[in-house]
């Protein structure tokens, strides 16, 4: 809640709308989503920026990263801040995941230009995972699980990585989690 007692829509640091507004935007589509992508972006090792440069500079980085992304997206794309150092770009018109990959490269270049302009006070990269926007038709929670998985997969590939969702990878992840859960249950039952 903000100072007036209303639900806060925009983030105080970046000025971006948040996760609930992102969700509302997906549900507000009059036509079923038939194209596009959702790109989940996170600053790699953001906690290191806060630790070494302080929280005020960390907030400044969050704001400037958002500004860099805003400069890179088109009028048909939307940018939201989810939590912490995580953002999502929504594109409901693109017909290629290659468009998402190209956008991520453009954003990374713009962020590098920001780092140089700050005389390398903090050096960082971003990682991104993208999913087909049509996954939103499966419901918000399932869609969220898939774009969260995509970002985690990108980060597991190493810093400054981009990953385009593959169902086979997700199925393997779910199978592994199911096995781990079964092992935990069998240990707990002993």
Describe the function of each predicted region.
Residues 44, 188-189:
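Short acidic/glycine-rich beta-turn/loop cap or linker motifs at sensory/regulatory domain boundaries
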Residues 5-37, 44-70, 80-84, 88-89, ...:
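Conserved long alpha-helical elements within nucleotide-processing catalytic cores of c-di-GMP signaling
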Residues 43-44, 94, 168:
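PAS/PAC or PAS-like capping segment
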Residues 64-134, 184:
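GGDEF/GGEEF active-site signature
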Residues 31, 74, 188:
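Short conserved AdoMet
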Residues 79, 106, 110, 120, ...:
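Cyclic nucleotide signaling catalytic output domains
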Residues 1-4, 8, 169:
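Heptad-repeat alpha-helical coiled-coil signal-transmission segments
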């Amino acid at each position: 809640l903000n100072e007036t007692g209303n639900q806060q829509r925009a983030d105080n640091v970046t000025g971006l709308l948040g996760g609930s507004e992102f969700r509302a935007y997906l549900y507000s589509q009059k036509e079923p989503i038939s194209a596009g992508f959702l790109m989940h972006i996170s600053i790699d090792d953001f906690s290191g920026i806060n630790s070494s440069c302080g929280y005020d500079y960390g907030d400044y980085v969050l704001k400037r990263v958002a500004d860099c992304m805003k400069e890179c997206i088109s009028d048909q794309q939307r940018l939201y801040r989810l939590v912490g150092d995580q953002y999502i770009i929504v594109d409901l018109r693109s017909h290629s995941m290659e468009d998402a990959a190209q956008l991520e490269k453009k954003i990374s270049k713009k962020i590098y230009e920001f780092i140089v302009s700050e005389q390398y006070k903090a050096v960082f990269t971003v990682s991104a995972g993208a999913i087909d926007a049509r996954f939103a038709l499966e419901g918000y929670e399932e869609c969220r699980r898939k774009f969260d998985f995509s970002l985690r997969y990108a980060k597991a590939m190493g810093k400054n990585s981009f990953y385009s969702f593959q169902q086979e990878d997700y199925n393997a992840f779910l199978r592994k989690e199911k096995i781990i859960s079964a092992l935990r249950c069998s240990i707990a039952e002993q």
